[in-house]
Structures are given as structure tokens and as C-alpha cells.
């Protein structure tokens, strides 16, 4: 089901044009209009899911399969020397369009692009790691 106000739903339905790389019945992939690098592509579900945590696993698997195809094409055709495959889930994680999508960002030697993951909390002591692991496990069970 589409969200009428969603930018990516409008692109997926053809209401807004894009530079399409790939499309099937469930997914569309297109060049990012504000690319981090040459070939930066977004892989977007056609059905509206707000973010990674709210998207069915089979859909996530398909999106990442398409992301892998695009990664391979960027390495082969654009001579990328690496690829970042990134999902931002939620506004606090940097998700600017609240529709599940994956960034495929081709990387090139010396491109100067950084992934700024600086620790924002004190490092956790090794004695606290089992407690943290158990907290997360509880949410899975």
C-alpha cells in the first residue's frame, strides 16, 4: 500500500521521474539525486514500509539481493574498488525519507568519503557486555 505523501512511493508509482537502474514487481532502484559518490543508488520497496524494523524479512532479503546486484555492477562497470551498503532506520539514525530503502554507495580509492562513526557513549567494559547481550536477546525471544 502506498503512502500518498511519500516521496519514494511517488517515485515507485511513476508520479515522479527517476534515473532507474533496476525494477521488478517489488523493488525499484534509482540514482540518488544527492549522491555521495558516482553511482550512488537507492534500492526502494514499492510497498510502503516506514523503516527497516517494520519491513518483513522476506522483503528485506529481496532488497539486499538487488543491492548486491547493483554493487557487483558498480564494481564491474564503474570500476568501484569497494561499496558501502547502508540502511538508516529512524530519524535519529539519519533516515530522511521514512520509507525503507538501502543506499548502495560505490567507493573509489582516495574518494575522501568518510563514515563518521565516532563513539558517542563511553566504551562499555567487558564485564558489562554479557548484560547488554542478554538485554538484546530478550527482545528477540
Locations of the language-model features?
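HIT superfamily nucleotide-processing domains
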Residues: 1-141
Amino acid at each position: 500500500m502506498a503512502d500518498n505523501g511519500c516521496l519514494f512511493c511517488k517515485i515507485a508509482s511513476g508520479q515522479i521521474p527517476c534515473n532507474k537502474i533496476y525494477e521488478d514487481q517489488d523493488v525499484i532502484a534509482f540514482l540518488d539525486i544527492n549522491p555521495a559518490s558516482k553511482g550512488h543508488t537507492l534500492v526502494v520497496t514499492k510497498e510502503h514500509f516506514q523503516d527497516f524494523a517494520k519491513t518483513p524479512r522476506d522483503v528485506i532479503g529481496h532488497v539486499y539481493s538487488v543491492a548486491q546486484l547493483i554493487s557487483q555492477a558498480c564494481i564491474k562497470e564503474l570500476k568501484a574498488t569497494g561499496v558501502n551498503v547502508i540502511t538508516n532506520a529512524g530519524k535519529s539514525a539519519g533516515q530522511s525519507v521514512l520509507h525503507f530503502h538501502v543506499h548502495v554507495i560505490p567507493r573509489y580509492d582516495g574518494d575522501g568519503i568518510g563514515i563518521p562513526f565516532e563513539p558517542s557513549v563511553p566504551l562499555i567494559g567487558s564485564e558489562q557486555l554479557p548484560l547488554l547481550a542478554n538485554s538484546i536477546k530478550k527482545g528477540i525471544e
